[in-house]
Every structure is written in C-alpha cells, then in structure tokens.
Amino acid sequence: MASEDCKQALKLLARSRNVLVSGAPGTGKSKLLAEVALAFETAFGLAPAGGPPQLNPMGGIPIPPAAGAVKDIPAPTKMDRKVFRTVFHQNSKYRDFLSGITPAVNKVAAGPDFTIVKGTLYRASEHAKGANGAALLIIDEINRGPAVQVFGGAIVAIESDKRLASDGAKLAETQFFEMLDPVSGDVIEYALPHDL
C-alpha cells in the first residue's frame, strides 16, 4: 500500500508532470522517490510493468487503493512503464543527459574514434514516445550539478505545457530545441513527449 506522500507525489505528477522534492538530509526523500518509482512502474498494481495483464489463476484481483486512483497516476492508460534515474554532480554534462560525442576507448583503430551517446533524458523520452510507453525520470541531487548546462535547450521544453500532445502531435506551445541525434549524428529539432 502506497503512503500518502507517494499518492500525493503521483497525483502532482499526473497533473503537472514535474515535481521537485526538497528537504534536509535524512528526511526520507530518497525513500519517497523509490516508493514513487515502484508505484509508477506497477500503476498501483493495475498495469504490471513489462506488458499487458496476464491471467494468474492463483493471484488476487488488483484493486485500486482508493476510488479514482487510476486517474491519479501519470499516463494511466499506458502499460509499458519504465523509470530512468540519474544523479547530478559537478561533472554532469549535457552529453550524459541528452546526447553528445565521447571518445570510444575500447575500440582498436588506427586513430582516435568517437561515438554518440544517448543520454538519460533522451532514452526516457524515446521510451515515452512509444505507442504504449510512459517514462518517469528521477533526477537526484539536481542542485549539485550545473542544471542549466546539463539541460541545455531542454530546460524550457521540460515544462508540462511545452511538450508534445499525448498523441505525439506538435502543439502551438510545444518547445523544440536542437540536439545531436544519437542515431544519425545530425543536429535535429527535438521536443519532449507528453508521457514523460
């Protein structure tokens, strides 16, 4: 059974899609985020992570903890739910969060070689863009890293009213930003999905 703080955090995420948890060290922020992550992945037991419900003749019937709980979670109709986590620190980089070029150190080649990295926000966004996908991005210690540098153009695009529509369509308010496409290597315009 989820705690009241967890339910409140999920309700806020369903409404605004962004929640900032703050407090003094040792007050239970990490524990709350772990509980929120589990509740998000399982949708309070209504939508098991990893696919549609499976018949289990020995299992119980999943019942929401309270009336209306289904709508009080982010992306209640999405079944492919995944949590992505990252921790910000002094050396956090844009390339680790969105995309960028890094040296390929394990390749045997005549000269230097580079690879394009898919960052945490990019991977979460691509998962949420899937037909049945929803992603929860947990950024721990956001105040310890250079957040503006790490987010880059996504700092505005992460606002809930600046994202794509729930069907992936562009809206008048959708905020696009340029980034290096990890697949093609080209600079592309990118927007964040509704179910992130």
Feature-to-residue mapping (PLM):
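AAA+ P-loop NTPase catalytic core and its hallmark functional loops
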Residues: 1-196
